[in-house]
Structures are given as C-alpha cells and as structure tokens.
Amino acid sequence: MNVDEAIRDLLNISTDIRSVAVLGPEGETIACGPGTASSGLAAAADRLWEAASASAAAADAAALDHIVVQDVAGAVAVLQADGRRIVALTGAQPAVGLLLFDLRTCLSDAFVEEDPA
C-alpha cells in the first residue's frame, strides 16, 4: 500500500476527518487530501508541534507522540511515528481515541514497505 492508498482508506473509515496530510522527516508534505485546507496543513502542524514540544520540554515532560487541539467546531490532531507526522482536521466532536488509532494505522500502512520485517 502506498501513502495515497493509505489516505484513501483512512478517509473511507474515519468519517470525522475532513482533511489530512502526511509529512516527511523535514516537515514536507508527502501527500494530502481532500479540501483546500490540505495545502496549509504542513506549516500549521509544524508550528503547533514545535510550540507543544517546547512547552513539554520546559515542563520536563516526556517527548510528545501526538497532540490534539479541540474546540466546538472540530479538532486538529498531529501524530508522530518513525520520523513522520500525520495531521488531520475533523468535524465537531470527534472520537479522539479512535481518531488517533486511525491516524497511527494510516501512517503505518503508508510506509509498510519501508519498515524492517
């Protein structure tokens, strides 16, 4: 499965997600879809991640593997694994635990051929 197929599967199973982007190790967009918000997701996710990481470091907290910012209109979720990040925008009241599971699965599926056996 490639990254575009993994995103397509994610969007088919997770009805909460409105837009998603997969980011590479340098924060570059590898793939995204759908919607006009996708093009700006990488930069926004990078700024959000850096701010949250700095806050965690200042508090001597553990390194982050995900962040979720939620309000009445929806949520932004960023998850990091194996040097890559995935960011999603959702509609109102997403099931956050399921959302994070789906994002982790998408990221894993997108790069399954690169992972050591």
Where are these regions (language model features)?
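Non-catalytic interaction/Regulatory regions outside core domains
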Residues: 1-25, 29-117
